[in-house]
Amino acid sequence: MFCYQCQETAQGKGCTLKGVCGKTAEVAGLQDLLMYLMKGISKLTTTLRKQGVESSTANKFIVDGLFMTITNANFDSSRFVSKIKEAYQLRENLLNELHRLGIHLSLTCDCLTWKSDKVEEMEVKAKEVGILATENEDIRSLCELLTYGVKGMAAYVEHAYNLGFEDTSLYAFMQDALVATTRSDLTVADLTQWVLTCGEYGVKAMALLDKANTSTYGNPEITKVNIGVGKNPGILISGHDLRDIQDLLEQTEGTGIDVYTHGEMLPAHYYPAFKKYKHFVGNYGSAWWKQTSDFETFNGVILFTTNCLVPPRSSATYADRVYTTGSTGFEGFPHIADRKPGGSKDFSALIEHAKKCAPPTEIEHGEIIGGFAHEQVFQLADKVIDAVKSGAIRKFFVMAGCDGRMKSRSYYTEFAEKLPKDTVILTAGCAKYRYNKLPLGEIRGIPRVLDAGQCNDSYSLVMIALKLKEIFGLDDVNELPIAYNIAWYEQKAVIVLLALLYLGVKNIHLGPTLPAFLSPNVAKVLVDNFGIAGIGSVDEDMELFLGK
């Protein structure tokens, strides 16, 4: 195997025996083969689209397939084998549709023809079509950067789809981009442009999801979230999918089961539509990577809706209480099927299971505050502007992104602690867990940590920056008193980064390490054109951002 799509890749170079994430070489290979087949399917859908034919089946298949290959989403080899077999059938159906239209493609790429139902042969083929099949280091780097951006975009598109919101231009771009990675005629300059265009569509995807979430559940509002526990048995829901938590809250109401959020599901508490549920108790635990201890003490049922699943240790006592749904999977964990059109997912098995469990053990108590998405911050605009003009707020620090296991990520806690009292942190994503429980105080009633929500809610931070640019009458968003010190981990962070670059944001500091998939030449392009930089020591970076 060879995989270097996440920040924790082995030795900062690539995983070759087993993923640091826990995925096996077999699963890594099946993911590579699925990606290869989806590139072939995309060749067919892009050809059909030119004839005015849109395949909703293919659109959904590709989005689902991309999401399944995101870091920490799916570790179940049987699910990938099934998906690969579905790809064969879908490919055949699309070819038949083209033939019906009188179009006969030259099937020179065996991504359009290769087929085997034998897992051993799938594994052999995967070695031929994996990342290292592209020999030129810079071309490979740009193709993977584009691919990871598309994977992150697919996650946001899927969440919007689950709420009934679609934009066919996003499907078209994702498929065009997958085809671009197969073209031998594209130069480094060509692929660089594809990467920047990916950022443009990333903004569209985040805007679509923001519209889907806020149209369905209302605009997030300032909310204090309980981090203690109740007395009833509970279900802990992790991941990002708000439609899943809607279904779960509706089905658990009146059952005597409490619902808690975990990790990136914390921002569900900020939406007005969910506040009516009295059994929606609070948030339990910390960031995704601490789940192996958090889940032990939760005592109840755990539901994964999206990525951020960590394989349980062999000694884990909670493994028989974990369920997956959507893109997620792990061998031995029961999987809840997708909802049928107009229906809901059936969580009755989880509810009955939870009734037999003990209530959660309290591991902390108190409250954390969040809900500072764009509309809520716009309502505070006068207060914020006055604080900036008076000097009460000297600078904003965008510290959005992901958390992870590496010890070096303690940098972000120390950075937040050492920031002067006249600065404010703008955050989104699970990076917040490094500092959202610190007593950092307020500035004139404005909390010094403004949490906009999930990783996709980085869109809110962009909207806030653009609004401030407008209010202050500036020509360039980079003239604002905002610094960007972003932590990344997986592919959704990649699309957020590309979106920021598309919007013209410069001098972003990215840590705790720069991506292994950036070749020296590609990294130089990002440094020279956008001022991308890594992180140093906290004191060095503090001086860099604020001066002596």
Curated annotation (Swiss-Prot):
One CC-aspect GO term: cytoplasm
Localization terms from the record: Cytoplasm
Residues holding hybrid [4Fe-2O-2S] cluster: H240, E264, C308, C402, C430, C455, E490, K492
In-chain residues carrying the UniProt-annotated modification Cysteine persulfide: C402
Keyword Coiled coil: no
Molecular functions (GO terms): 4 iron, 4 sulfur cluster binding; hydroxylamine reductase activity; metal ion binding; peroxidase activity
CDD domains: HCP
Biological process per Gene Ontology, one example term: response to hydrogen peroxide
Record keywords, A-Z: 4Fe-4S, Cytoplasm, Iron, Iron-sulfur, Metal-binding, Oxidoreductase
Any Pfam family matching the protein: Prismane
Family: Belongs to the HCP family.
Name of the protein in question: Hydroxylamine reductase
Encoding gene, per UniProt annotation: hcp
